[in-house]
Amino acid sequence: MLDLKLIRQKPEWAKEKLAARAIKGEEIDELLALDTRRRQVTVQTEELKAKRNDVSGQIAVMKRNKENADDQIKAMREVGQKIAALDKELAQLNEKVTYILVRLPNFPADDVPMSLNEDDSREEYKWGNMPTFDFEPKHHWDIGEKLGILDFERAAKVAGSRFVYYKGAGARLERAVYNFFLDEHQKEGYEEIIPPYLVNNDSMFGTGQFPKFTDATYTITNDGEPLTLIPTAEVPLVNYYRNDIVDAEKLPVNFTALTPAFRSEAGSAGRDTRGLIRMHQFNKVEMVKFCKPEDSWKQLQNLIHDAEDLLQKLGLPYHVITLASNDASFTSAKTNDLEVWMPAQDRYREISSCSNCTDFQARRAQIRYRDDDGKLQFVHTLNGSGLAVGRTVASILENYQQADGSVKIPDVLVPYMQGQTAITKED
């Protein structure tokens, strides 16, 4: 959530920043007008309540002195009616201000490409050599089905489209990938967490998924209370400290978790209908950081490095891009995507998004720490995929495919595959 005080102090700056995220200036004008009226009503209410308290004291004295206080009592009834009307207006104003404020995205950082067009995202650099083949490279879904390690057809029978069965060596490869990821993150100082896979509405609000993206999630009811299947481990990890004060000496705090992610993919009809790229359920290893505001840009670089390190050790070519302002996530001030090379598609595909959310989530979730002066401040939160497991499997199948239809296993994963160096049809 944005700092309303900052919008109040720098309205034109706020309009310019949010225009790069498709927010109209009229929305900010409406917010500020409501905020101004709210502050006026608050002052009027406080003045009337102070007057009521003073006169109530006078009435008590008059009654003790057996003086007639009818006029004062009548006047206080009128004051009470005015206070009740103002309280009602104030509640309505609070609701309207909150409605607008919680739907405004984060301010984009100064070095982000300011554009409403995702094509204006900026490539920063590339790593690795794209593999060359003396045959036409196959798509990962064709490879997986021919090797008998991925079964989309039976998954569709059981659950519908955008689901998959991993089988045999495919299941072992998926497990090898996420165990490798978790081990590497642990070496880098992340604390491994196994969080709840269902979260309440307050948690979804805290990380910014609700109220804007309710259509993109799956929700169940438990004893009349809604619970949402997590779209990412970011939600339970960030909310670990919701309504809490983090010990400043512990900052930065680094969490990592392997969880399934559940997404309805509303609005994705016709996109990536085959393969592992866009699923309703997929495994993902997430990285989350909590830090002091002055450290968050350095921590973003650390986050990117930790994601890159995995791709480099797997020998998978990729590039890093800075997303255009309107392509970044709702909560993010800056997002760097890592996109891995997919030979059969002849293009890069996202495998990690690393975002600095500044104090946006912390303000919604009320996550704070005490500074050197003992004053409460909001932490900054960061999150990144480290990495999306299914997409990693897909990229391994495509980049390491062999002419005979087998797939070589990246060297770093061989120990996780009990020494197996390739997946063949016999596996």
Curated annotation (Swiss-Prot):
It catalyses: tRNA(Ser) + L-serine + ATP = L-seryl-tRNA(Ser) + AMP + diphosphate + H(+); tRNA(Sec) + L-serine + ATP = L-seryl-tRNA(Sec) + AMP + diphosphate + H(+). GO terms for biological process: selenocysteine biosynthetic process; seryl-tRNA aminoacylation. Its EC number is 6.1.1.11. L-serine binds at residues 232-234, 286, 385. One of its GO terms (cellular component) is cytoplasm. Catalyzes the attachment of serine to tRNA(Ser). Is also able to aminoacylate tRNA(Sec) with serine, to form the misacylated tRNA L-seryl-tRNA(Sec), which will be further converted into selenocysteinyl-tRNA(Sec). Homodimer. The tRNA molecule binds across the dimer. This is Serine--tRNA ligase. It comes from Lacticaseibacillus casei (strain BL23).
